[in-house]
Amino acid sequence: MIFWRAIAAAALLTVTPALLAGEIPPEARRSGYSFMGSETRAMQDDDTSNPGMLFVLDGEALWGRKTGGADKSCADCHGDARTSMKGVAARYPAFDKPLSRPVTLDQRINLCRADHQQAAPLPYESRDLLALSAFVAHQSRGVAITAGDAPELKPFVAQGRDLFMQREGQLNLACANCHDDNFDKRLAGAPITQAQPTGYPLYRLEWQTLGSLERRLRSCVTGVRAQAFDYGSPELVALELYLMSRARGLPMETPAVRP
């Protein structure tokens, strides 16, 4: 599948001028939801049909479960997530003062596990980490994204933007080639969106499971036949931060559904 998408991407860019449109102005930015077909939108809108909600329910159970050497649950510190976590995911990645760098929501969950629960970190893309992340992010559904506002984040946002604009891989393509210049077209039968990460972690029909934004970014990098960054790498965190800051003002949708 990745091979054929790479071929399709190369074909698309041979007939379409690259990097002519420039960055999408804020007033023209749209969630990927608006590019979806009616069946996909209906699946996302109905919580009883949205498969991502199964992960949210798992995350709710994990929220109240004591773990680690401290024998503490998330709820012991944060109480009712419906109030304490409302708006939190809309701010992430956020700046961590002790680390002097931004951290993603997944990384924050693992930092909390280490610092307050004395528990081992959950592996990236593990069901438990995705479930907790989905549960926390779900509390912000409908809340406008505000990520990237802190002054300390400015150089990291700039780093993410540079990565988004940078050509790479054997196909010599940048993220911007597809998502700034060619959105609203199709690639290998799927709609090209603006890459506004409003609903992560989201349920991707191709994956048949929930996945993080980092998984999606790694897939795109592999698609242009470049070496994917490691999960949790500074590059992926910077890209996620830039994309979330670029989506400021759009409402959170977690768990979104995409093809």
Model-derived regions, located:
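Short Cys/His-rich "knuckle" micro-motifs
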Residues: 84-87, 185-189
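Short cysteine/histidine-rich metal-coordination sites, predominantly Zn2+-binding motifs
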Residues: 89-98, 191-200
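N-terminal, post-signal-peptide region of Sec/Tat-exported proteins
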Residues: 45-76
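Post-cleavage N-terminal segment of exported redox proteins
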Residues: 2-13, 17-55, 83, 93-158, ...
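Conserved short C-terminal alpha-helix that flanks the catalytic cleft of nucleotide-sugar-dependent
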Residues: 63, 163-164
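Cys-dependent condensing catalytic cores that perform Claisen condensation/acyl-transfer
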Residues: 231
